[in-house]
C-alpha cells in the first residue's frame, strides 16, 4: 500500500485539469512542470504544450505541442466517485500540431503524466 507521502509525490508529478480548463506547461524528466491556467486560445511558446479539457461526448482533451519532440503520455480519467481509469492515448505530435482524445466516460478531471519521447505516430 502506498504511503500518503509517496501518493502525494506521485500526484504532484502529474497535471490535473478539470473540464473547462486550459493549461500551458513544459516537460522535464517526463513530467509536466511550470503549469499555469490560461485562456483556451492561448498560444504555447516554443517548448510548451497547451492542454484543454471539455465535456463533449463524455470527456475530450485537446493538446497543442509547440516543441520539436513527439511524445507518448499517460492520461488518467478521474470520476465523480474519485475512481480512476487509465485511458488509451495517442501520440502527441511535435511542431505545433494538435492532438485530440475523446473517451465516453464523464470525468471530473484528467491527469496527464509520464511523457516519453517517441518516433511513433500511432495510438497505443
Predicted regions and their residues:
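Intrinsically disordered, low-complexity Pro/Gly/Ser/Thr-rich segments with frequent PxxP/GP/PP motifs
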Residues: 15-21, 27, 79-114
Amino acid at each position: 500500500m502506498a504511503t500518503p507521502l509517496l501518493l502525494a509525490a506521485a500526484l504532484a508529478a502529474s497535471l490535473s485539469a478539470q473540464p473547462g480548463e486550459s493549461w500551458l506547461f513544459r516537460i522535464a524528466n517526463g513530467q509536466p512542470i511550470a503549469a499555469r491556467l490560461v485562456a483556451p486560445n492561448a498560444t504555447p511558446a516554443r517548448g510548451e504544450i497547451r492542454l484543454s479539457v471539455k465535456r463533449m461526448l463524455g470527456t475530450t482533451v485537446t493538446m497543442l505541442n509547440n516543441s520539436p519532440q513527439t511524445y507518448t503520455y499517460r492520461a488518467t480519467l478521474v470520476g465523480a466517485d474519485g475512481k480512476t481509469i487509465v485511458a488509451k492515448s495517442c501520440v502527441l505530435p511535435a511542431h505545433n500540431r494538435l492532438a485530440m482524445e475523446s473517451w465516453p466516460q464523464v470525468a471530473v478531471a484528467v491527469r496527464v503524466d509520464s511523457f516519453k519521447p517517441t518516433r511513433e505516430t500511432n495510438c497505443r
